[in-house]
């Protein structure tokens, strides 16, 4: 009789053993496999069952790779600088240095409850000066390469977080962190020239084994388009306004022009009659968030009083301002062709601007247009020398024609904008720049890095556009590294993405104080083979990491240019009715009580069983009870048969190979919920076979090895009980034999005139005549008439044609 399954005693025993005798040891002979989780923000609320999901998935995959003979690189660290940590500290009224350390301690305890096989010797923390020395070093290298520069510009401003935001941190016009509507603020900012890498970031997506959804999100964010820039002279001025258009074929239909209110020429285009209205409109637009400006509601605008000249036909084009045009896309100015664009049509109709149709179906002009004609194809009309051409042909040829005329040029445009890298906050890496009145912006010498973040009592954001560091005069005032003259330090800090854009490189050489990563170690252990985390990072972190990796490859630090070979995005675990778990909603399920009551192994398995891992799944506490019962049943099955000297029957051999086949293939396709259902299904089969005469040792040990990545504690205990002195994770992942899986007999239907009358059991490789004879015997007196034709589809069906 098997002793009861005591999860508390068993799990504590094996955690102690793993700590004293690590199971993942680099012997220098095994190939490496680098499996990485997106490292967490050390938030104050700790981990809930939703966080566990990604960590369990990565741990299962990691242990699977160990059993396949790899040396596993599976580290963990802390994304501890930036807004999440600082906002929590402000909320608690405690210095972020203290709250961050406390939160890390708590989350590390919770992560250890998962029994994940993390190598804590590789741990990194983005707030550690030994780490952010290299974050600053990368910035200095980018500065020297011309990729980091200063620019005064209207930036996204979060009035709640009181800091600037990159475009990628604005979701539907709101701050990605706190959800507040984002406004615009003119500030001098540090920028990173990510746009220089736009084509490589786009083209190299083809190299990656990533979800197509993520690749599309990055493709759309980079937003490459082909078109033309067209120069419109301003009437009465020796100036031109350049517009970008993807439809230069419609240039004859441009009846007005719209500039973003932030456009450099917006104010100077105002006449005496319009100046007051123009300045009021510009001010009102500055108070709106981008989401308000782009929402599909009634368009607003103001006429500047000035005109541009259509360079193709000499027509006067009124110049308007409207907040539906954004300064940071294209040139911040658009030519408007209301006959062929819904938004332009709405604007022209509201403000009584002429509408000229230049593309028509079959060349026939629409009288009294009530909506824009937006069909892609048509014949050119009202277009001078272009009349009669097919618009699809002209669209391709027009950029070169415009270029030859000297009124514009063929252009490729990107939605991607340079990365706003400054943050007006305290809790971040100091930007290693000194501002000298003589020399300008000068980088801190590399040998003086890290530039330490000074200790302060007042760390709250100022909201003035200045970082709290600006008040520390003894830190700000310094000397120029170039000329020795009095100078001032840069007081903005880096964004939270600075450290997370390269941290995965540092794990494999985290104690190196001479270089970011030793080249020999980088060549041996990098890049990441499998990266696991939420899809919410598709554009932000994943795009920035690719940019940093390409830059570090360019300067010779590493010899690869993509950080993560394969990516898996797990879905969210939600509370009831699909609502996201959060403390404020009161629907957070803590793993601590579940581990105490059911054990870590039960919780790990339920995290996977709850639904397809790539989809959101609703949590139900009752589900873990069923998983716990399954583990107890297998525990009893294994121990009840442990000492039985049972010889493997053909049926047991077949079941064993099918078990290995099904579990392996489901695991390889990341169908982890069906892996768990497979374990349950085969456990039931083995329990039935056990009643008939027992289960052989090899079949049970095979099951234990397969189960080990999912339920490591119970698997280790059973492996030991079966007489093994080494860890189950030093075993080898079982293989299956297709021949051994074949059924000796299968059931096939027997039909008369296409209608099934009975079934027969046959050998799939049996003789056709014997099978037909067996079929006729089984039918007996059901055959009424003369058999005209006998059909046998091997292994599938018998059909008799009877008349």
Task: Please provide the spans of the model-predicted regions.
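Helix-rich, typically C-terminal accessory recognition domains appended to large enzymatic cores
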Residues: 79, 144-158, 410-441, 496, ...
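Basic, alpha-helical terminal appendages of large translation-related enzymes
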Residues: 1-21, 25-32, 260-263, 272-275, ...
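Conserved oxyanion/phosphate-binding beta-strand-loop segments in alpha/beta enzyme cores
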Residues: 1-36, 66-75, 99-106, 210, ...
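Alpha-helical recognition segments enriched in aromatics with Gly/Pro capping
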Residues: 306-312, 316-329, 358, 478-613
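Catalytic alpha/beta core of large soluble enzyme barrels
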Residues: 58, 71, 263-362, 367, ...
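Residue patterns forming the tRNA-binding/recognition surfaces of aminoacyl-tRNA synthetases
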Residues: 4, 13, 17-21, 91-241, ...
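Amphipathic alpha-helical
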Residues: 195, 200-224, 260-302, 447-479, ...
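N-terminal catalytic cores of NTP/NDP-binding nucleotidyl/phosphoryl-transfer enzymes
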Residues: 27-94, 100, 123-138, 161, ...
């Amino acid at each position: 009789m098997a002793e009861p399954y005591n999860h508390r005693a068993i799990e504590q025993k094996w955690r102690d053993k793993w700590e004293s005798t690590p199971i993942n040891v680099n012997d220098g002979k095994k190939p490496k496999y680098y499996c990485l989780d997106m490292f967490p923000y050390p938030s104050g609320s700790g981990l809930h069952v939703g966080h566990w999901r990604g960590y369990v998935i990565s741990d299962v995959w990691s242990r699977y790779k160990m059993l396949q003979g790899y040396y596993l690189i599976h580290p963990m660290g802390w994304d501890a600088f930036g807004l999440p940590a600082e906002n929590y500290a402000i909320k608690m009224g405690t210095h972020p240095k203290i709250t961050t350390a406390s939160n890390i301690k708590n989350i590390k305890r919770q992560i250890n409850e998962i029994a994940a096989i993390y190598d804590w010797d590789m741990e990194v923390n983005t707030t550690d000066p030994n780490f952010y020395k290299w974050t600053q070093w990368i910035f200095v290298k980018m500065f020297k390469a011309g990729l980091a520069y200063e620019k005064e510009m209207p930036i996204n401003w979060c009035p709640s977080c009181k800091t600037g935001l990159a475009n990628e941190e604005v979701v539907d016009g709101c701050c990605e962190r706190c959800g507040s509507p984002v406004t615009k603020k003119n500030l001098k900012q540090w920028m990173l020239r990510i746009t220089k890498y736009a084509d490589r970031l786009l083209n190299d997506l083809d190299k990656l084994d990533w979800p197509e959804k993520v690749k599309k999100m990055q493709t759309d964010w980079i937003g490459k388009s082909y078109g033309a820039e067209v120069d419109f002279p301003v009437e009465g001025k020796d100036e031109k306004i350049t517009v970008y258009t993807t439809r230069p074929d419609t240039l004859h239909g441009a009846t007005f022009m719209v500039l973003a209110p932030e456009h450099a020429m917006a104010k100077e285009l105002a006449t005496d009659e319009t100046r007051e209205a123009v300045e009021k409109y510009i001010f009102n637009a500055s108070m709106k968030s981008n989401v308000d400006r782009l929402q599909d509601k009634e368009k607003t605008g103001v006429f500047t009083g000035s005109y541009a000249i259509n360079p193709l036909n000499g027509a006067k084009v009124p110049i308007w301002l409207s907040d539906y045009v954004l300064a940071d896309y294209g040139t911040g100015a658009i030519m408007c062709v209301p006959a062929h664009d819904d938004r332009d049509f709405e604007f022209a109709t509201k403000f009584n601007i002429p509408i000229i149709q230049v593309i028509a179906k079959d060349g026939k002009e629409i009288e009294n247009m009530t909506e824009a004609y937006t069909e892609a194809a048509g014949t050119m009309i009202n277009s001078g020398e272009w009349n009669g051409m097919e618009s699809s042909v002209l669209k391709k040829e027009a950029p070169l024609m415009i270029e030859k005329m000297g009124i514009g040029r063929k252009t490729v445009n990107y939605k991607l904008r340079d990365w706003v890298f400054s943050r007006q906050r305290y809790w971040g890496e100091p930007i290693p720049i000194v501002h000298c009145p003589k020399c300008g912006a000068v980088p801190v010498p590399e040998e003086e890095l890290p530039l330490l973040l000074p200790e302060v009592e007042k760390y709250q954001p100022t909201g003035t556009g200045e970082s709290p560091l600006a008040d520390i005069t003894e830190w700000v005032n310094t000397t120029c590294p170039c000329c020795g003259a009095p100078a001032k330090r840069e007081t903005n800090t880096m964004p939270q993405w600075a450290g997370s854009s390269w941290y995965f490189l540092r794990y494999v050489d985290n104690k190196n104080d001479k270089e970011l990563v030793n080249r020999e170690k980088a060549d041996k252990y990098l890049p990441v083979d499998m990266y696991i985390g939420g899809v919410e990072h598709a554009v932000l972190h994943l795009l920035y990491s690719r940019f940093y990796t390409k830059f570090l490859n360019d300067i010779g630090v590493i010899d690869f240019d993509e950080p993560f070979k394969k990516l898996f995005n797990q879905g969210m675990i939600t509370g009831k009715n699909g609502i996201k778990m959060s403390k404020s909603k009161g629907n957070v399920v803590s793993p601590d009580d579940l581990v105490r009551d059911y054990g870590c192994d039960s919780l790990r398995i339920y995290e996977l069983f709850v639904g397809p891992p790539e989809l959101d799944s609703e949590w139900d506490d009752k589900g873990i009870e069923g998983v716990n019962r399954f583990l107890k049943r297998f525990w009893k099955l294994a121990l009840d048969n442990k000492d039985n000297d049972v010889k493997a029957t053909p049926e047991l051999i077949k079941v064993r190979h099918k078990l290995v086949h099904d579990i392996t293939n489901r695991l390889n396709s990341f169908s982890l919920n069906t892996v768990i259902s497979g374990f349950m299904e085969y456990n039931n089969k083995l329990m039935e076979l056990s009643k008939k005469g027992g289960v052989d040792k090899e079949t049970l040990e095979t099951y234990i090895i397969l189960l080990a990545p999912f339920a490591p504690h119970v698997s280790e205990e059973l492996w030991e009980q079966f007489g093994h002195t080494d860890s189950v994770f030093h075993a080898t992942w079982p293989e299956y034999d297709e021949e051994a899986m074949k059924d000796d007999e299968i059931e096939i239907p027997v039909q008369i005139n296409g209608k099934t009358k009975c079934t027969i059991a046959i050998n799939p490789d049996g003789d056709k005549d014997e099978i037909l004879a067996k079929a006729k015997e089984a039918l007996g007196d059901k055959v009424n008439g003369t058999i005209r034709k006998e059909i046998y589809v091997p292994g599938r069906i018998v059909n008799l044609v009877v008349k």
